[in-house]
């Protein structure tokens, strides 16, 4: 294998990435101008990550007239447009800004200086920040003059952001003040604001204020003073300031709760002429037309008459009502009671939304598979029409029902079959989704849900693959989904049933089954019925020191068939028994112009009893725009299974591969390239690597020649696939159009030679021809894949 062409391309990419060219446009005439700033941070108790974060922070404190605006493009081009004529006064302002910013980090002895290189008209300024020692918190206490406020603060002191022997920072102080404001508002003090609190500090050195005639005591105090200069400390106390409006520190209770269930903007609260009013134990309900039942409000409004006002219940009520989807806008007004100084009335104004929503859409696709779950898809041009009707309020209980009708056709382009039929397949499907905004109390307690809903999903579909087969499908899902107190999403499907009936099999399809025996164990009439569990959690850290955001997500899916509901004697001859599990982990660090994204996926399906493989609609597959991008959809695996030889008309090629086990990991480096249309379209790029494969868990044919498709740990390294490539992303803000060019570097089908490592034979001279020429289809079939997708792959 000749690796030289590929090595040349890789070397060129590394060489270009190490070189930069700076272009300066519209520079000032006959004046020195600023082309760059350098910032050096000396000292300070920072680790490597914190030091880099501080340097980024200091850069943001440059005065506007000291900033150099650089536009990067294609890794190597840097453009400076209209550089500013250099003025030393702006550098002085920048140095003062940086010194002040260090105070916010607890470095009150920090010093900032600057020097400039003016040897020619291109000026570079170097800022030197000497951090010194941070001022540490010696003690911290609350001095709130109102006993109840003092008690609330002390009860939650363990949650304080002000910690002993840590630097006193502006961020920590503001966070502590905001935390206490929330605590007070959750205990009846709804008018309390941050303006009523002040953080005070005392850093007095005793040696400078204590008078003594004892020389030994004087030496001790002087030594203490020197130590405090070397390791400065501060004593903090949080005081309450008496506000001009004394009611700001009053505690309030809820008097009456008014619900205006079909509020109109021109309604006058005191005018009830054309309003129906009903009084319940906790609410006063007013409406022009009764849209909802009373128990719906009791379940979703968590505040009650006579309760202490709590801010968290205020927002929880808004979120609960918003989640129902019945109202266009939701507003809760707080009105102080004139007769009782410590009472407030709540007026909940609910502006109704449209009860019915009708939507329609037309989809156009060019894909390796059909738009349905059916098998045997080729490279097809598809058209699909979708119609949707949603009723948001059934039975006056905010129960929503959505009807979806889909009709589609796939046109044969002749690239994967020599059939002369224009229409390759057609489909028709109907789904009905019912969402009920309530779940059983036992489920709430079991999973500690804070919000949740029940669902009933039903579907029926018909797909006709001309000259191959027909497929009818039925599915039913009943269960619950909700968000836990830790913001984890858990979905339980207590009934998870799918029935796929394969019939009208043509002679052509039967020949395919004979030529590919493994298909018989996947493509057949199947009935699955059981339960399923889905778990998802997302952790976002918007305050990561070196990035705009940092996000981790974890998903787990588990389902079974034949162990619970499957014990019922229904459709025994078609019933499939299995357990299927998969986990997915994603990690993304986003910076201003770049991002790194990582994904890991593992899934396994275990056939039970006499079954040898999962049903085809439950199996795993790899390839395509969101998986192993070096292979087409369902184009990689199983194990080390060989590629079917290429033929000019692709006659008899069937390369769809699905399996019971999938392992995959992906990593992608994303970066901005250029703005095509400001504030509308941005061109971005991404370099990526995909690693993975699929396998069978058994050898269903009991044929030793097919053992290469079976998963075995000893063959894992040999049979793993690897592809790498580069893609472009056209970011339209509301969606991302993605194109990826991916090459195969490790091929499972060649695992018996060099463990599958084989770089694609491509060089500078023939790269364009091999990627785009019609005469190189066989080369692309064996080495390369081009995909188009919407939004990011993971």
Segments (PLM) and residue ranges:
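Bacterial Sec-dependent N-terminal signal peptides
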Residues: 1-36, 183, 600, 782-786, ...
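C-terminal outer-membrane beta-barrel translocator/porin domains of Gram-negative envelope proteins
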Residues: 362-378, 390, 493-682, 687-717, ...
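Interaction-mediating elements
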Residues: 20-323
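Conserved active-site loop/cleft motifs that coordinate metal ions or position small ligands
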Residues: 686-688, 736-742
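Flexible glycine-/small-residue-rich
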Residues: 23, 43, 129-133, 144-146, ...
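Gram-negative/organellar outer-membrane beta-barrel architecture
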Residues: 149-152, 290-291, 310-558, 629-630, ...
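Short beta-strand elements
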Residues: 108-115, 190-199, 328-335, 489-497, ...
């Amino acid at each position: 294998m000749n690796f030289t062409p590929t090595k040349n391309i890789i070397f060129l990419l590394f060489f270009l990435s190490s070189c930069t060219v700076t272009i300066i446009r519209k520079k000032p005439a006959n004046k020195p101008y600023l082309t760059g700033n350098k910032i050096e941070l000396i000292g300070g108790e920072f680790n490597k990550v914190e030091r880099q974060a501080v340097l980024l922070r200091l850069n943001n404190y440059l005065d506007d007239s000291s900033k150099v605006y650089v536009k990067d493009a294609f890794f190597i081009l840097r453009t400076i447009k209209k550089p500013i004529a250099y003025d030393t006064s702006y550098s002085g302002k920048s140095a003062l800004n940086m010194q002040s910013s260090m105070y916010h980090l607890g470095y009150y002895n920090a010093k900032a200086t600057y020097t400039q290189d003016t040897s020619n008209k291109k000026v570079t300024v170097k800022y030197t920040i000497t951090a010194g020692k941070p001022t540490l918190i010696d003690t911290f206490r609350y001095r709130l003059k109102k006993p109840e406020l003092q008690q609330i603060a002390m009860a939650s002191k363990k949650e304080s952001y002000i910690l002993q022997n840590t630097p006193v920072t502006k961020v920590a102080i503001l966070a502590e003040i905001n935390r206490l404001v929330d605590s007070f508002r959750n205990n009846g003090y709804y008018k309390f604001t941050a303006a009523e609190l002040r953080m005070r500090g005392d850093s007095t050195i005793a040696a400078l204020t204590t008078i003594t005639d004892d020389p030994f005591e004087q030496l001790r105090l002087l030594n203490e003073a020197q130590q405090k200069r070397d390791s400065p400390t501060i004593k903090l106390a949080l005081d309450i300031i008496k506000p001009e409006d004394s009611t700001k520190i009053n505690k309030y209770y809820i008097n009456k709760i008014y619900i205006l269930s079909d509020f109109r903007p021109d309604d006058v609260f005191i005018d009830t002429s054309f309003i129906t009013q009903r009084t319940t134990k906790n609410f006063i309900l007013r409406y022009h037309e009764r849209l909802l039942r009373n128990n719906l409000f009791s379940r979703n409004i968590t505040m009650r008459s006579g309760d202490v006002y709590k801010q968290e219940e205020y927002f929880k009520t808004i979120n609960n009502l918003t989640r129902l989807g019945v109202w266009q806008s939701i507003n809760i007004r707080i009105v102080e009671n004139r007769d009782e100084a410590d009472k407030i009335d709540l007026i909940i104004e609910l502006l109704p939304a449209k009860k019915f929503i009708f939507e329609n859409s037309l989809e156009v696709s060019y894909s390796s598979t059909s738009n349905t779950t059916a098998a045997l898809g080729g490279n097809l041009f598809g058209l699909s029409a979708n119609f949707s009707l949603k009723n948001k309020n059934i039975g006056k209980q905010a129960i929503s029902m959505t009807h979806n009708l889909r009709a589609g056709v796939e046109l044969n382009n002749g690239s994967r079959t020599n059939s002369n039929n224009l229409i390759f397949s057609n489909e028709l499907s109907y789904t009905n989704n019912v969402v009920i905004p309530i779940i059983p109390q036992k489920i709430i307690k079991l999973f500690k849900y804070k919000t949740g809903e029940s669902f009933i999903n039903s579907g029926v579909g018909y797909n006709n693959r001309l000259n191959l087969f027909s497929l009818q499908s039925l599915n039913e899902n009943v269960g619950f989904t909700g968000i836990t107190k830790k913001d984890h999403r858990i979905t339980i499907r207590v009934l998870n049933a799918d029935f796929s009936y394969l019939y009208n099999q043509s002679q052509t399809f039967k020949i395919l089954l004979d030529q590919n025996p493994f298909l018989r164990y996947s493509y057949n009439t199947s009935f699955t019925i059981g339960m399923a569990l889905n778990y998802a959690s997302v952790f976002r850290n918007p305050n990561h020191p070196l990035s705009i955001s940092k996000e981790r997500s974890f998903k787990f899916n588990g389902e079974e068939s034949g162990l619970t509901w499957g014990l019922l004697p229904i459709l025994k001859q078609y019933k499939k028994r299995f357990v299927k599990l998969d986990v997915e982990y994603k990690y993304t660090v986003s910076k201003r112009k770049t991002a790194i994204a990582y994904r890991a996926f593992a899934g396994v399906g275990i056939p039970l009893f006499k079954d040898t493989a999962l049903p085809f609609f439950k199996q795993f597959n790899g390839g395509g725009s969101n998986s192993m991008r070096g292979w087409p959809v369902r184009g990689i695996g199983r194990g080390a299974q060989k590629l079917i030889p290429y033929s000019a008309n692709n006659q008899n090629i069937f390369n769809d591969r699905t399996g019971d086990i999938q392992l995959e990991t992906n990593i992608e480096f994303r970066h901005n390239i250029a703005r095509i249309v400001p504030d509308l379209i941005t061109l971005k790029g991404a370099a990526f690597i995909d690693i993975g494969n699929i396998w069978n868990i058994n050898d269903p044919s009991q044929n030793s020649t097919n053992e290469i498709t079976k998963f075995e740990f000893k063959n894992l390294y040999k049979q793993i696939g690897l592809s790498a490539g580069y893609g472009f992303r056209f970011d339209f803000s509301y969606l991302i159009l993605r194109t990826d060019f991916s090459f195969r570097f490790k091929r499972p089908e060649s695992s018996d030679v060099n463990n599958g490592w084989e770089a694609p034979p491509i060089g500078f001279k023939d790269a364009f021809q091999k990627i785009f020429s019609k005469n190189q289809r066989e080369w692309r079939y064996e080495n390369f894949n081009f995909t188009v997708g919407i939004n990011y792959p993971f």
